[in-house]
Amino acid sequence: MTDEVLFVSRETMGAAWPLCRPFIVHAVNKCGDWTIEQVEHLLMLPTAALWIATRNDIMIATAVTEVDGDQCKIVALGGMGGPDWRCLLQPLEKYAKSMACARMRVEGRPGWQKALPDYHQPYVVLEKRLD
């Protein structure tokens, strides 16, 4: 079994995005904090990056990151289910260090805590919808 994580360059983003988009649509629909249009706009900025994880040459996950000051945020991560997408973490963390980031940040549902045992919860976010 061969896992590979690919950083998508600006030059290949146009060709890669249609393949990645369904994974990210699924992720943003579950989360609700971002729309796919916002993610697409973010990817036009130099602070954002698109990542693809493959296993045996089959795409299993894709992620969007954003460097914001001294942190690298995983904005959206969509995958085939299960822990397969975890192969993304080490390359994303290495990239964050190369961008002078002191930390990685993931904001999401409580299930992320279980999926990311090396990460800690520095605070709790509470919200109330004002419909």
Where are these regions (language model features)?
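Conserved donor-binding loop and adjoining core beta-sheet/short helix segment
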Residues: 45-83
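Active-site rim helix/loop that mediates acceptor-substrate recognition in acyltransferases
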Residues: 28-48
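Charged/polar, solvent-exposed surface patches and flexible loops
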Residues: 15-22, 26, 41-44, 87-90, ...
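Short amphipathic alpha-helix that is part of the acyltransferase structural core
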Residues: 1-34
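Terminal substrate-recognition subdomain of acyl/acetyltransferases
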Residues: 1-3, 11, 107-131
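Acyl-donor binding region in acyl/amide transferases
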Residues: 70-117
